Each structure stands twice: as structure tokens, then as C-alpha cells.
Amino acid sequence: MKRIFLFLATNIAVLVVINIVLAVLGINSRGGAGSLLAYSAVVGFTGSIISLLMSKFIAKQSVGAEVIDTPRTEEEAWLLNTVEAQARQWNLKTPEVAIYHSPEPNAFATGASRNSSLIAVSTGLLDHMTRDEVEAVLAHEMAHVGNGDMVTLTLIQGVVNTFVVFLSRIIANLIARNNDGSQSQGTYFLVSMVFQILFGFLASLIVMWFSRQREYRADAGAAKLVGAPKMISALQRLKGNPVDLPEEMNAMGIAGDTRDSLLSTHPSLDNRIARLKSL
């Protein structure tokens, strides 16, 4: 739960900071509904797009991922060959492949586009899983890349952020208006920030729901690529190994929660396994 609230707080904080910067620069949302919507879109999409463009850099820095340029071991060579073969099946440029040091079994995919991506696995994943299970995890992450989930998630976050800013400003305009038609600037800013935080939390439920659906879709993509039994075996292995990632990377990891929640980025492992068994 702590990870989820930090994720929500980060997104809301980005919106607040952008609003403050625009206010300091003298760029405001005054005008008609069309101008306000355009302003809201700028605020709503800026943070999401910047995060997407910097996603590989942020991912590498946050977990200390080391990209495999030239394989030094048989295991690294196998990882590169497996990812390359899966990328060919998706008709994609081979993603960068990286390993990061962590005892917890996990993996994630990120990148600005389908042909500019990164797949990283933890040393814990390589230590705890069989080759078949690691292959399934790689296929799951490749499905995220092939489905364009990183870009889609960014667009959805940008859209909901836009309406969060738009609706909070509409309400602030109404509340801050004085009887003589003038407007209290301090009240307007304070009210808009309060409602931005409130609507930001509610809008995040939509993003979380989409994230859970993309996990089911990536599981199905992995099953199609390597077979459902391998993917089921990998998820069952994760049930016995609690995992963790930095907050900003949590939505991109393979592991999920042990139970379902509206604030979860992943469905429960039991539900994912049940969905795979029904394919």
C-alpha cells in the first residue's frame, strides 16, 4: 500500500510543480473553456511525456541496471539470444537487455517506443527460476513492449491528468469568485490545488485499472509465445518469493500483489494464474 500511495503522490506532485512553474512564468489558465482545456492538456501531458522519454535512463539509474553489450558468461549470452529471438517473433528491434543486482526475483520493461526499449531482469530472478520460467518472464516483458504498453499508459495518464487540471480549475473559478465578480487569486490557487489532489487520486484508479488489464494481456502474450505452462510456473514461483522495486518502477515489474485491490498496478498472482489456465 505504501508503494501505491507514493506512486499516486509522485504523479500529483508533478502536476502541482508544473502548475507552480507556469504560474511563476506568468502563464495562466484565464480565458474560455477552450483555452482552459488547452492549458490543462499542456500541464497534463508534460510530465507524462518527459517521464516516457527518460524512462530508460531513470530505470537504469534507479536499480543500477547494467546493459549487456558483450556477453561475459553463458547465462548472459542465453539472455541476449532469447530476447533477440522473441523480438523477431514480434517483428521488433531487439530491446536492450540488462541485469540488476537484487535478491528478489523480478523483471521489467520500459522505453519510449516499441523499437527503443529495455528489458531488465534481477539476479534474484536468474537465481530462483528455471530457464523455462525465465524465458516466460522475458516473453511477458516482450509482450509489454510489443503491445506498446509504455506509450499507451503514458497517453492514458496524460488524458486523465488533463481532465484533473481542467475540472479543478473550473471548480476553483466558481468558488473563488466574489459577489462583485472579481476573483481572489489566493483562494483560486488553493482551491484548484486541493481539488487537483482529490481528482488526481480518483483518476489514478483509472490508470491502475488499465495497468491491471495490461498485465493480463502481457501474460496472454507470453503464453502465446512460449506456452501457458511456462508462464504459470513462473507466476507460481513468484508466489513464494516476495519482491520489491523502486516506487517509480513498480508498475513495470513482473511480480504482482498477493490480493486484488483498486490501488494495485497488478492483478493478484492467483487471478493471473487462473486466467492463464482458462486460455
From Swiss-Prot:
Any one GO molecular-function label of the UniProt entry: zinc ion binding
CDD domains associated with the record: M48B_HtpX_like
InterPro entries, per the entry: HtpX_protease, Pept_M48_protease_HtpX, Peptidase_M48
GO biological process, one term: proteolysis
GO CC field: plasma membrane
Protein name stated in the entry: Protease HtpX homolog
Signal peptide interval: none
Record family assignment: Belongs to the peptidase M48B family.
EC identifiers of the protein: 3.4.24.-
Cofactor note: Binds 1 zinc ion per subunit.
Species assigned in the record: Neisseria gonorrhoeae (strain ATCC 700825 / FA 1090)
NCBIfam families: PRK05457.1
Compartment annotation: Cell inner membrane
Membrane topology (UniProt): Multi-pass membrane protein
Gene that produces this protein: htpX
